[in-house]
Swiss-Prot record:
EC number: 6.1.1.11
Pathway annotation: Aminoacyl-tRNA biosynthesis; selenocysteinyl-tRNA(Sec) biosynthesis; L-seryl-tRNA(Sec) from L-serine and tRNA(Sec): step 1/1
Organism: Zymomonas mobilis subsp. mobilis (strain ATCC 31821 / ZM4 / CP4)
Function: Catalyzes the attachment of serine to tRNA(Ser). Is also able to aminoacylate tRNA(Sec) with serine, to form the misacylated tRNA L-seryl-tRNA(Sec), which will be further converted into selenocysteinyl-tRNA(Sec).
Alphabetically ordered keywords of this record: Aminoacyl-tRNA synthetase, ATP-binding, Cytoplasm, Ligase, Nucleotide-binding, Protein biosynthesis
Name of the featured protein: Serine--tRNA ligase
Family statement drawn from the similarity comment of this UniProt entry: Belongs to the class-II aminoacyl-tRNA synthetase family. Type-1 seryl-tRNA synthetase subfamily.
Name of the gene: serS
Length: 425
């Protein structure tokens, strides 16, 4: 959500910044609605002052025995109250209309974010690791992993497309990946582990920016709850409607959860394999911090995610997303893209975003600065640390052998109960 005071004071700059994200100017529309609401608020204030004055005069008239005059003024007060009630309803309706409009406008991009339309305009800023040189033509995981226990057909029979069922060592490897990532974030990187609910109310998704704009991408239950598309929703909403002490910041939360996405806009894309599923596991990182520390905190989170890829010896690159490819709530986003030899390309495996004060204003989350007066909006950040399914894909493709087996990375051996290779079953 945007600060209406900023739009009032710098409407041209607001429109200019919004145009970088491919949006038409909206400050005029916003200020017209805001002006109408403020005019009504001023009229209400004037009427309240008049009501109070007439009420005072009624008391004086009663003391002086002027009952008829007092009765006339009582009728005047009743008329004022009726008019105020009508104006209050109009003001509330205008306020709701303004808030609904503001809630559909994306965050503004940071100055260092490259301007562009889509992923073709993203900027690669770092690359790690050299792709493995195979002595055979590497396959896509969807072509050989079913023989190792990755069952798409059985999952489709019970749930439909974009679901997977894992058996035996494959299931254990999937579990090991998530557990290893969670251990890294909690034991090495200082995140507090959270076990959150998987169903949330509207206000939680509004706070992080998924609602109202992206309803079609979510699963909605009949009792008006929503399956979480990411643990970001739960972890960020921990501080909803809170005023935090600056000395308590940063707060860092992490969770390993299933995530659920309708993928309404992904028809025909990534229909094979694990890349795009309705249900998948992910380790999420969330940080709550001050405006002064948010950029440094974002880079720290990037490093937390990259360290896992390096420990798994998976080649990857870091990409700074352009204005047209960023998520709705982000002011700056880095994507980590892992090398998939079967597809002969890099694919996103983590997205780490600084959302500035955008989500904090939607959640009404503030902090008390140690120096100075008043409260200020916190900055929120989120990122994958990492997506479990896509990490499994990366391991399958990068560690595949010519005989169809897959060697398991050494750092996962402690979680595998002696299993060091996925064998054909």
């Amino acid at each position: 959500m945007h600060d209406i005071r900023l739009i009032r004071s710098e409407p041209e700059n607001f429109d200019k910044a919004l145009s970088r994200r491919g949006f038409e100017p909206v400050s005029k529309t916003i200020l017209e609605m805001d002006g109408e609401r403020r005019t009504l608020a001023l009229e209400l204030q004037t009427l309240q002052t008049k009501r109070n004055e007439v009420s005072r005069q009624i008391g004086q008239a009663m003391k002086q025995g002027e009952k008829d005059k007092a009765e006339e003024m009582k009728a005047e007060v009743s008329a004022i109250k009726e008019k105020m009630a009508a104006l209050e309803g109009e003001e509330a309706a205008l306020g709701d209309k303004l808030q609904r409009f503001l809630s559909t406008i994306p965050n503004l991009a940071a100055e260092d974010v490259p301007e562009g339309k889509d992923e073709q305009d993203n900027k690669e800023v770092f690359r790690w690791g050299e792709p493995r040189q195979f002595s055979f033509k590497p396959k896509e995981h969807a072509d050989f992993a079913p023989a190792l226990g990755l069952d798409f057909d059985t999952a489709a029979a019970m749930s439909g497309a974009r679901f997977a069922l894992m058996k035996g060592a494959m299931a254990r490897l999937n579990r090991a990946i998530g557990q290893y990532m969670l251990d890294c974030q909690t034991e090495k990187n200082g995140f507090t582990e959270i076990a959150p609910p998987l169903l949330v109310r509207d206000h939680a998704l509004f706070g992080t920016g998924q609602l109202p704009k992206f309803e079609e991408d979510l699963f909605h239950t009949t009792d008006d709850r929503w399956l979480i598309p990411t643990a970001e929703v739960c972890l960020t909403n921990i501080v909803r409607e809170s005023i935090l002490d600056e000395k308590a910041l940063p707060l860092r939360f992490t969770a390993l959860t299933p995530c659920f996405r309708a993928e309404a806009g992904a028809a025909g894309r990534d229909t094979r394999g694990l890349i795009r599923q309705h249900q998948f596991d992910k380790v999420e990182m969330v940080a709550i911090t001050t405006p002064e520390q948010s950029t440094a905190e974002q880079m720290r989170m990037v490093e937390c995610a990259e360290q896992i890829l390096q420990n798994l010896k998976l080649p990857y690159r870091r990409v700074l997303l352009c204005t047209g490819d960023m998520g709705f709530s982000a002011t700056r986003t880095y994507d980590l893209e892992v090398w998939l030899p079967g597809q002969n390309c890099y694919r996103e495996i983590s997205s780490i975003s600084d959302c500035g004060a955008f989500q904090a204003r939607r959640m009404n989350t503030r902090y008390r600065p140690e120096e100075g007066k008043g409260n200020a909006a916190v900055h929120t950040l989120n990122g994958s640390g990492l997506a479990v399914g896509r990490t499994l894909v990366a391991i399958l493709e990068n560690y595949q052998e010519e005989d169809g087996t897959v060697t398991i990375p050494e750092v996962l051996h402690p979680y595998m109960n002696g299993i060091t290779k996925l064998e054909i079953i």
